[in-house]
Amino acid sequence: MPDLSLLKRRITLLCLFLFQFSCASYLLDETQEQIKDAVYDQRYSEAIISLEESKKKKEIYKEKDSILWNLEMGMLNHYNGAYEKSNKYFSNAEFAIEQAFTKSVSQGVYAFLGNDNQLQYDGEPYEEFYLHAFKALNYIHLNKIDASLVEIRKMVYKIDQLNIQLRGLADTYASSDTLNSSIDWDTKDINVQNSPFARYLAANLFAALGNVDAARIEREQFNKAMTEHYPLINFSSQLGTSLTQSNRNETPEWSLGPNNNVLLLSFTGMASEKIQQDLRVYNEYWETELKVSLPILNPYRSEIMGVEIWVGDSLMGHSILLESMHKVAQEVYTSKMPIIYGRAVLRAISKYSGTQWVENMPEEKDPFFAHLLEIAGDLYKEVSEKADLRSWSSLPGNIFSHAFQLDPGSYEIEFRYINKLGLPLYSEFREVQIDQRQSVHLLETHLAY
């Protein structure tokens, strides 16, 4: 028989811990929402200062959240034009993600029986390969084209390995699952094998460097990637009548000429956010109903369906959707759902089995405390089962692009955002000085509409 006085002290500490843990995880969720608000309003410097202060105090972003913190800092500094700083944070995140994945595979499924919010955030697979895209852009801004191409190759490789990575993780969990969970760990194949964004960047960079053969190969890969990507995003169904007529079920022709020296990228919308979905799952072996909380991706619906590029009174062209990052994220995340669901069910089973001794405690010894323990056990199962809603909040949702040639000189370029009806929504302006000694002049805009 356990020492009741000791148990009373422990149950009090448990209740206090549950309260503190619940507050901490919700506080992080709230902070992530504030980051999204700042990104929407383009208050990047303010968000950077806020993140730096929160890391110093260790009240919100703890060591287990370091990957998330570095991803946010990398993206916000990129938006703010601090490209070297941005790459420092992205490199920190890249290294930590690789270490976290190795650790998760070696530990197996039982490393995740606690609440995910208590564990190190190891990043989503799509977050891992998109960080290389923004590292590549940072290097272009720093005029380090070779380094940019290295990051593009890393991105392409990691996308190519997605199915192998997820299947390997699922097999590891399935082999270590001994709780009679009856979970189907098999992940479905991902319909993401390539990246139009990565191939488009590579084709433009090789063309600018005069590497004709490499540019041709990347152009072929780009066309293949676009053919695979457009059915995934069902782009034509998202457009209004005026835009649909010119793009119905067609992959757009992209200018990848050898003389292009201006590359324009417009990032629109925002990343899909994770929301909690609570389920009640009946387990036949344990003959009980289990509470399972799942993080579900909720897509952000952008109002922007195209971008017109103007130089003075001249329309230089239309930037049409190059890659839907949030659709790619949704596809990758959907394939990973058996793993997410399986981990949640195993947590629920472990909590259920771990609190069964309470029901067998003789009430005549201390009926009040026995009842209190039962309540505490139920409270633990309910409160501790909170979905892990951590995700890269500042990541954009879509990428639009256009490339063309300008003679040396100073120009003001207008990015005119077009809505689904084909009407102008908003305009942003960028100044550029074309220097014939510089092979690529990259201009970016970001509008989270």
Label every PLM stretch briefly.
Residues I60-K64, I97-G108, D160-A170, N223-T244:
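Boundary/linker segments of alpha-helical solenoid repeat arrays
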Residues T244-Y449:
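Short loop/turn and low-complexity linker motifs enriched in small/turn-promoting residues
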